Amino acid sequence: MMNESLTEKRNELSLSFAALGVVFGDIGTSPLYAFGQVIKYFPINDHNIYGILSLIFWSLIIIVSIKYLVIVFRADNDGEGGIIALAGVIRQKIKQPGGWLLFITLVGIGLIIGDGMLTPAISILSAVEGLESLSPNLAKYVLPVTLIILFFLFKMQSIGTGKIGVYFAPVMLVWFITIGILGFLQIIQNPKVLMAINPYYAINFFMIHKYLALFILGGVFLVMTGGEALFADLGHFGKKAIRTGWFAVALPALLLCYFGQGALVLMHTEDIKYPFFSLSPDWFLPVMIILATLATIIASQAIISAAFSILKQASLLNLIPRLKIVFTSKFEKGEVYLPLINFILALGTCSLVVIFKSSSNLADAYGIAVNLDMLITTVLVGIIAYRCWSWHAFKILIFLLILIIELAFFAGNIPKLLTGGWIPILIAFLGFVVMYTWHCGFEKLRELHHRDALMDAFIIDELNQNKISRQPGMGLYIIDPYDCEGESLLHHLRLNRIFFENMVFVSIKIENKPYIPIEDKFELIKKAEGFYLIFIHYGFTENINLPNELDEMFKRVYLPFDVIKNKLIYFIEIVFVEMTGERQKHMYLWQKHFFSLMIRNAVPDIQFYQLPYNNTIAIGTYYQF
């Protein structure tokens, strides 16, 4: 019993250590730019610095430690976190939640795409800016070096991070220890800054500066960027490991670093351009720049991988067009590479660096995207707390208090819309337009298939009455998600009068859960004599490999005929959309053309389901929009 307990603790510590290299990269590198961004708004004096440090301290405690690690962690979807997981929880409890949930989910995914561009840009740029602290003459190399690092960062995505990923956690542990020590060395020279832990200084700051204090909130919010990753990566590491890593390593190191920067600027009230790098002694500065660059590369890798993961899930749920998915590891099923998304993120990130030129300028664009993402999480978890947990009024009031605090941060970020904050909003809007257009087109296809279902119902009767001649063999028909029970393929059979002796229609169902246990994965329905419909249920985080699933299915699902696996013929549908000039419900003409373009360029079923090329027949179907 004792050995089992020791083993469990070791596993937990091992997971906590691994989480340092993935979960805390983004929030862990915020000290590079966050404090310097905050102090530029007001004169440096005791009251202002104490007020700022108090706001930083209580923001990390209330929003990250309490909201995320205590409340939001309760809203996991079978151990999985993130916006799609939250939406899945709501769909499980509220059968028809309405269009509002789709809207919030699509906006959230759009913001994540923007985050995937902004995080690498501001993180790596802020690290390379340390060259200016080394020598002002090196300032001209900041942009070229940043762009070179970003080029290789996105270039390496296609080969995966399996071999070098083992070094992420050790590097981040060294990073946290280093920034904690550097901050502590400044605090012991000016320990009075620890008084800022008292919330009085945060309240007093607002009483002195009144509405002007809202401007500071936009900067203070930067210390929490990356906080949403704690929940998004829940499925990889678990609650205990993330909580241990946060409270034992990340949070203490961050607080020491921020308070150390506060102590430093109070002792040196002259203009300090980069307070973070000023913490380091001159002899250690080159090492610090290298370490900061490595840490920001790791943080950027984490957000890129998260973007790949969330968009893969969105693709499975048909929220976006099907994407080419490359699995970069034989051992880690979650390691995926999306070539198109990688290109978009790389282009967007490098463009942001060239346009804004400094981390200080980029900070205005960065905070508002993460702020909106956190607000969406708060709203969704609030709905779950009310509808699923049956929280009473007092607990709901606590959650409303958190929402009010986050809305105050959002108010502080609104002035940044004019200085770059509009960029993540634009990215999210463009992403929303793509996803909503795809959704509308998909629903139109469902409507057309429902109409065909009424036309083809007579086929079932004829099959049951043996009025249709059949040829020997077996046909395996893969049904698209918009085709509930294979109406389009039945329509093809009706026109061509080609009926196999045994026909199996396979429908893929993506559920609102991350994983589906093997015993619940398959569902068999006999539609007619020799005609079967099989549903294969997947979770939204699972990888689809249809031939492998069919092997497992034939072992578990009884069929009254023999299946010769190497002679299986797969039938799939290729959709062609023909436009009409009419505006239809929820779709403008430009949306119909855009949907037609997307469906033509989406990854075909044969690749998406990983079907064998030599044993697959594609059937083209035209639909008039």
From Swiss-Prot:
It is a multi-pass membrane protein. It comes from the Bacteria. Keywords: Cell inner membrane, Cell membrane, Ion transport, Membrane, Potassium, Potassium transport, Symport, Transmembrane, Transmembrane helix, Transport. One of its GO terms (cellular component) is plasma membrane. InterPro entries: K+_transporter, K_trans_C, K_trans_N, Kup. Transport of potassium into the cell. Likely operates as a K(+):H(+) symporter. HAMAP family: Kup (MF_01522). Belongs to the HAK/KUP transporter (TC 2.A.72) family. This is Probable potassium transport system protein Kup 2. The gene is kup2.
